[in-house]
Amino acid sequence: MVKAVCVVRGDSKVTGSIVFEQESESAPTKITWDISGNDANAKRGMHIHTFGDNTNGCTSAGPHFNPHNKTHGAPEDSNRHVGDLGNIETDANGNSKGTVTDSHVKLIGPESVIGRTIVVHGGTDDLGKGDNEESLKTGNAGPRPACGVIGISN
């Protein structure tokens, strides 16, 4: 079992943690998040970005992690970036907790996401269905108010 954690923070009040667990290279990865400080009753895009570089805030993280050179999509789509985690949904207090299992995201092997950045975006991810070029790259998920680097944990 490999475990990793990402603590997100930024220039906004959005903070939280995301935990990853994977049993083996062929197994799906369990992703659990607890994030607060977002707008109430909102959907906010959450993606794994290519670089673990936050030198200039979340903008240094680069594009979505996309080792297969696909277009942006929903987590359940076969044509999607590895880093496309879709939207988190917030409650009346702007908090979001949840768990998903993802067979594209890996902690083990050559496409490991350890050392890459998770960005919690300021807008809703249109899941690549926005009928424009930017939708196919970013899902039009907007600014990057909070992020953190995924690190191995015990």
UniProtKB/Swiss-Prot annotation:
Which Pfam families does this chain map to? Sod_Cu (PF00080)
Q: Which domain of life is it from?
A: Eukaryota
Which residues participate in Zn(2+) binding? H64, H72, H81, D84
Task: Tell me a GO cellular component.
Answer: cytoplasm
- Positions bound to substrate: R144
Q: Can you provide one Gene Ontology molecular function annotated for this UniProt record?
A: superoxide dismutase activity
Instruction: Report disulfide bridges, numbered on this chain.
Output: C58-C147
User: What SUPFAM superfamilies would the database entry show?
Assistant: Cu,Zn superoxide dismutase-like
Q: What is its main location?
A: cytoplasm
- Localization terms from the record: Cytoplasm
What is the catalytic activity of this protein? 2 superoxide + 2 H(+) = H2O2 + O2
Comp. bias intervals (Basic and acidic residues): 124-136
* Binding, Cu cation: H47, H49, H64, H121
**What keywords are assigned to this protein?**
Antioxidant, Copper, Cytoplasm, Disulfide bond, Metal-binding, Oxidoreductase, Zinc
What does the UniProt cofactor note say?
Answer: Binds 1 copper ion per subunit.
EC numbers listed for it are 1.15.1.1
Function text: Destroys radicals which are normally produced within the cells and which are toxic to biological systems.
| Assembly behavior | Homodimer.
- Tell me which family the UniProt entry assigns to this protein: Belongs to the Cu-Zn superoxide dismutase family.
Q: What is this protein called?
A: Superoxide dismutase [Cu-Zn]
Give the species. Answer: Colletotrichum gloeosporioides (Anthracnose fungus)
